[in-house]
């Protein structure tokens, strides 16, 4: 059963919020609170969000990323057991420019769990930060011999 917040989530899409508030929480508060566990906790948070907001296909990822304010996601390759995406946009550029070690594990975990839910196979995702190209590459892989 959905909580009242989850039931009203669609209404939140219409409210505009500045990136400053979002980045304060994501890039200052959470790393300070979680310390060395920040990266792994963000990955698991992404997986948790994917279970709360399951999508029908990976083609829906870009729209979700836009609505969530995570940036512009583009599929760049699709293989039998691997998908590769590029994540870019103003919020990504800012993070790449000003963070010594920017973390995109929330997005990686979200993609991994979505693929795992869709394929019923264990999936893992990882990030590659491309500072010069001003983008992040997110790769998800799964093994057909490794069912959930």
UniProtKB/Swiss-Prot annotation:
Its domain of life reads: Bacteria
Q: Which residues form a coiled coil?
A: none
The gene that this protein is the product of is yslB
Q: Name one Pfam family in it.
A: DUF2507
**Which protein are we looking at?**
Uncharacterized protein YslB
